[in-house]
Regions:
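Short alpha-helical segment that forms part of, or immediately flanks, the ligand-binding pocket
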Residues: 30, 53-57, 71-72
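A short hydrophobic beta-strand element within the catalytic core of glycosyltransferases
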Residues: 39-40
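Nucleotide-activated donor-binding/catalytic signature segment of Leloir-type glycosyltransferases, i.e.
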Residues: 4-30
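Aromatic "clamp/platform" in nucleotide-sugar-dependent glycosyltransferases that forms part
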Residues: 44
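A charged, aromatic-enriched C-terminal amphipathic alpha-helix characteristic of glycosyltransferases
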Residues: 103-132
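Short hydrophobic beta-strand element within catalytic cores of glycosyltransferases
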Residues: 61-64
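Short alpha-helical donor nucleotide-sugar binding micro-motif in glycosyltransferases
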Residues: 31-36
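Conserved acidic donor-binding segment of nucleotide-sugar-dependent glycosyltransferases
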Residues: 76-77, 81-88, 97-102
C-alpha cells in the first residue's frame, strides 16, 4: 500500500497511490507516519528536512536522496538508506533490501529512534542555550 503526503500538490496521474494526504494538521502528522513502514524522500534540495526524522520517531525507516539538509543527521546504513538522485532502480533496490533483511531493518529502526531522541525539541533548546553561554 502506498501513501502520498504533500502540502502543495496532488500526486501526478501516473503515480500509483492508495492514500493521499494533503495539508495534514501538524498534530496528526505522527499518526500518518506511524501508519507507514518506509518513507521514500526524493528531495534534492532542502534545509533541515524533518520527514525522515519524523519517520524515525514513529519507528519507521527512510530511503532517502542525500541533500544539504538531511545529511546533518542521516547516515547511510545506520539510520536510513541513501540512494542517488534520479536512480529509481537504486531506490527500489533499497526498499527491497529493507523488506528482505529484517536484521538491517531492525538496526536502522533502533538507530533511527536514537537519532530522533537526540533531536527532540527539549534537547535542541538546551543545545541552543549552551551555544549562547
Amino acid at each position: 500500500e502506498i501513501s502520498y503526503l504533500s502540502y502543495r500538490k496532488e500526486p501526478k496521474d501516473w503515480y500509483r497511490v492508495d492514500r493521499f494526504y494533503n495539508r495534514i494538521a501538524p498534530e496528526k502528522v505522527g499518526e500518518v507516519y506511524a501508519s507507514c513502514d518506509i518513507l521514500i524522500k526524493t528531495s534534492i534540495v532542502e534545509s533541515f528536512s524533518y520527514p525522515p526524522l519524523e519517520m524515525m520517531a514513529t519507528g519507521g525507516v527512510s530511503v532517502v536522496v542525500p541533500n544539504g539538509g538531511n545529511v546533518e543527521y542521516l547516515k547511510d546504513d545506520y539510520n536510513c538508506l541513501f540512494y542517488r538522485q534520479g536512480d529509481i532502480d537504486a531506490g527500489v533496490a533499497a526498499v527491497e533490501k529493507l523488506l528482505n533483511d529484517k536484521k538491517l531493518r531492525d538496526k536502522i529502526i533502533k538507530n533511527g529512534q536514537k537519532t530522533a531522541q537526540a533531536y527532540q525539541w527539549s534537547k535542541l533548546e538546551q543545545r541552543i542555550v549552551d551555544i549562547y553561554k
